[in-house]
């Protein structure tokens, strides 16, 4: 003879079973969705890799053509720059402080990207003795974001541990993964401002071997100012 089970207990068991099945279905759906998202992220990474490779090949071809014709190869003007604060902790003029804040270089060895245009270059001139900057390669941008990248989410500094952090904040702009973020910064895409503001200012180390002479400009054998493509060497030494 089967054991009597009160009606209220039967209802509770039924509800629990229904809830268990619903949660199992939800986990299954979430797993399938995440699998699909990962496939999309891999596809994007492969697409960008092909795009970067084609761009590099085009430059090589143009240089080769210039040599053959006896012409000079003129590289395209840089669209994005990376600035690093190397001086100035105490007793700064209010105008200098304001500009450093605009570039998000509040602390020593902070680094940040900025769009290269007439306005930004004129502004950067006002703080040149305190910063150095130059034009990062795609590889440098990638290493900065992967090795030292943190997101600014609701005013909090969050490590970029997975793509969902990017997607939650920038998905509405079509930026759903770290590779999207790198591409947007590298190409100075239509949502560069949003992508750049999403990134917390980079915290870099003192360069291996130290600075040469922070009192003088880079072109005079010192450290501050525009070091153009050689910013990549400095970033490498500070990662």
From Swiss-Prot:
It comes from the Eukaryota. Residues 1-37 are annotated as: Disordered. Keywords: Ribonucleoprotein, Ribosomal protein, RNA-binding. One of its GO terms (biological process) is maturation of LSU-rRNA from tricistronic rRNA transcript (SSU-rRNA, 5.8S rRNA, LSU-rRNA). Residues 9-28 have a biased composition (Basic and acidic residues). One of its GO terms (cellular component) is cytosolic large ribosomal subunit. SUPFAM superfamilies: Ribosomal protein L30p/L7e. One of its GO terms (molecular function) is structural constituent of ribosome. The keyword Ribonucleoprotein applies. Disulfide bonds: none annotated. Belongs to the universal ribosomal protein uL30 family. PANTHER family: 60S RIBOSOMAL PROTEIN L7 (PTHR11524), LARGE RIBOSOMAL SUBUNIT PROTEIN UL30 (PTHR11524:SF16). This is Large ribosomal subunit protein uL30. It comes from Tetrahymena thermophila.
């Amino acid at each position: 003879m089967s054991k009597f089970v009160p009606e209220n207990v039967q209802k509770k068991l039924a509800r629990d079973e229904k809830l268990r099945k619903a949660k199992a279905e939800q986990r299954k759906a979430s797993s399938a969705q995440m699998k699909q998202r990962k496939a999309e992220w891999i596809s994007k990474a492969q697409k960008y890799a092909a795009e970067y490779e084609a761009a590099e090949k085009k430059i090589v071809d143009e240089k080769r053509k210039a040599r053959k014709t006896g012409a000079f190869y003129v590289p395209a003007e840089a669209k994005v720059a990376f600035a690093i604060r190397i001086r100035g902790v105490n007793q700064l003029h209010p105008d200098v402080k304001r500009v450093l804040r605009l570039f998000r270089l509040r602390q020593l060895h902070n680094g940040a990207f900025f769009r290269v245009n007439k306005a930004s270059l004129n502004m950067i001139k006002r703080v040149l003795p305190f910063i150095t900057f130059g034009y990062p390669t795609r590889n440098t941008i990638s290493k900065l974001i992967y090795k030292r990248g943190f997101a600014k989410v609701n005013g909090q500094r969050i490590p970029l541990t997975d793509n969902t952090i990017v997607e939650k904040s920038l998905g509405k702009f079509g930026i759903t993964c770290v590779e999207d973020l790198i591409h947007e910064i590298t190409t100075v895409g239509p949502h560069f401002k949003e992508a750049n503001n999403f990134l917390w200012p980079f915290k870099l180390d003192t360069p291996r071997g130290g600075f040469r002479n922070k009192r003088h400009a880079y072109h005079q054998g010192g450290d501050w100012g525009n070091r153009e493509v050689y910013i990549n060497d400095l970033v490498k030494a500070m990662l």
